[in-house]
């Protein structure tokens, strides 16, 4: 049965009950008839002195929501149609509607109640105005709409191994099954002793200094712990240095915590290593910390020791805390060795994040951790804040914690994937070579993780809007990717794809991608 969302609107002294499906159909029909894109509507709204965001427009077009009355009037004005027709279809497309005297049956009592009650609207918090998370954003919403209509979408937008046939090691599943009866209650808010002990030993092998059990925290994935640590550290207006491109959760969490994310550049011409000169130039008296993502998402770059030592020197000179996102540290290829930056900074406050989601192909289990190391005296108050927030969420997923010790010990099956002949290794090589064969596309070879971040010749393809490019690719080839802007990259010239699908699927998708770029020119 069709689900209808009703709003009360007063146009020309008439109450109109609006069907959500009707509105999005009318909007898409009008835009198609007038050959108008979403980006055209957004630009037109700016010319009229109004603000209409990409996410808003995408949700209206996909039928996820209906705009407020003032926004509906703005859309009608831009598209030169009658607002009542656009919303409810009661009037001619190009004419203002007038009241009708058609006799109608008496409405059901519940409808009378709905029309007589004016319910206030609830808007999202203004704290979300500058938050971006396009890994699951408007283009993904459009893909979901297409799937609902029966389209088959190839999802190359997210590093989720399980749907592509990567299986959890049998020993891990067996261990969780055996321990489930003992996992029914809360654990210590920091995590199970066995899990934290295994994490401490792993951290010591990585060379992290001054690691203590009480400064290890398990979480429902690294994502929860990033948000927790940002809330514990940042006051309103505090600045934190974050790479560009970045994993967008860092920028989002810093913003939600009241901080101001400042992006330093990673240099594509230097294997996507951080530009240390640019990093230091962005530091002000308000800068509190810096973030590195190593191995990097979305570029797959693995930072060498000398680059990390340079970052440590910058942090030391300016007395900054270091946050290191190292979730892909066990997925390095081509002989590249991961060096934990905390191992180079025993005198600095460091927070290191890792987990099992990627290395053990168990993203759905939601198990990550963070380790506070180095100079803990200067972050004692921060640690109190972390403890407070950790206690407030009670504890992380206990069954997932129970398998950390097993997962970190013994044979690491991930190594079979990333060596020559391994599935991840070979698929990475294929995608890298196939992309470089496409005229107008260039790409730096990723050395770790699941992602590749190609560059498009924007002049050749006439690309000015990378979200529109992602939508065009989705509509024509049914391929879902993430635009470069979703990773806080300023130019509309990059996109990220995941090389997790099986080889035969990747071959088909890269052929489709080559065919798309062979003729694509953004209008």
Regions found by a protein language model. Give the residues of each.
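Conserved core segment of the aminotransferase class I/II
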Residues: 346-422, 432-434, 517
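Conserved PLP-anchoring active-site segment centered on the Schiff-base-forming lysine
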Residues: 232-254
């Amino acid at each position: 049965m069709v689900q209808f969302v009703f709003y009360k609107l007063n146009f020309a002294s008439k109450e109109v009950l609006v069907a959500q499906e009707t509105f999005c159909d009318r909007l898409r029909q009008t835009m198609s008839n007038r050959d108008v894109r979403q980006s055209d509507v957004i630009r037109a709204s700016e010319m009229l002195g109004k603000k209409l965001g990409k996410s808003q427009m995408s949700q209206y077009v996909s039928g996820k929501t209906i705009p407020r009355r003032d926004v509906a009037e703005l859309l009608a004005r831009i598209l030169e149609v009658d607002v009542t027709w656009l919303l409810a279809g009661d009037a001619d497309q190009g004419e203002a509607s007038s009241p009708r005297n058609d006799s109608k049956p008496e409405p059901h009592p519940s409808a009378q109640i709905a029309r007589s009650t004016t319910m206030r609207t609830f808007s999202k918090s203004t704290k979300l105005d500058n938050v971006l998370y396009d890994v699951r954003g408007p283009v993904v919403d459009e893909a979901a709409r297409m799937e609902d209509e029966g389209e088959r979408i190839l999802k190359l937008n997210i590093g989720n191994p399980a749907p592509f046939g990567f299986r959890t090691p049998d020993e891990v599943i067996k261990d969780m099954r055996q321990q489930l009866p003992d996992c029914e209650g809360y654990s210590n808010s920091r995590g199970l002793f066995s899990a934290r002990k295994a994490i401490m030993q792993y951290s010591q092998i990585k060379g992290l200094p001054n690691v203590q059990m009480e400064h290890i925290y398990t979480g429902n994935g690294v994502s929860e712990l990033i948000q927790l640590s940002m809330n514990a550290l940042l006051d309103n207006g505090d600045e934190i240095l974050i790479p560009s491109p970045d994993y967008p959760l860092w920028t989002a969490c810093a913003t939600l915590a009241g901080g101001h994310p400042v992006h330093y550049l990673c240099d594509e011409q230097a294997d996507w290593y951080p530009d240390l000169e640019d990093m230091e130039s962005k530091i002000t008296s308000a800068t509190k910390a810096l973030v590195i993502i190593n191995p990097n998402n979305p570029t797959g770059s693995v930072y060498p020791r000398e680059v990390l030592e340079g970052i440590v020197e910058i942090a030391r000179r300016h007395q900054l805390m270091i946050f290191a996102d190292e979730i892909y540290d066990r997925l390095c290829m081509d002989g590249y060795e991961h060096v934990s930056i905390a191992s180079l900074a025993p005198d600095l406050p460091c927070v290191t994040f890792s987990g099992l989601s990627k290395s053990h192909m168990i993203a759905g289990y939601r198990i990550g951790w963070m380790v506070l190391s180095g100079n803990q005296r200067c972050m004692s108050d921060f640690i109190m804040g972390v403890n407070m927030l950790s206690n407030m969420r009670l504890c992380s997923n206990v069954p997932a914690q129970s398998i950390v010790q097993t997962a970190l010990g013994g044979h690491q099956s991930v190594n079979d994937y990333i060596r020559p002949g391994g599935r991840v290794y070979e698929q990475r090589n294929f995608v890298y070579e196939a992309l470089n064969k496409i005229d107008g596309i260039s790409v730096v070879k990723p050395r770790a993780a699941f992602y590749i971040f190609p560059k498009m010749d924007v002049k050749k393809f006439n690309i000015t809007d990378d979200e529109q490019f992602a939508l065009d690719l989705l509509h024509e080839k049914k391929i879902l990717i993430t635009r470069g802007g979703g990773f806080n990259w300023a130019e509309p010239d990059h996109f990220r794809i995941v090389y997790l699908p099986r080889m035969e699927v990747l071959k088909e998708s890269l052929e489709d991608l080559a065919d798309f770029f062979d003729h694509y020119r953004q209008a």
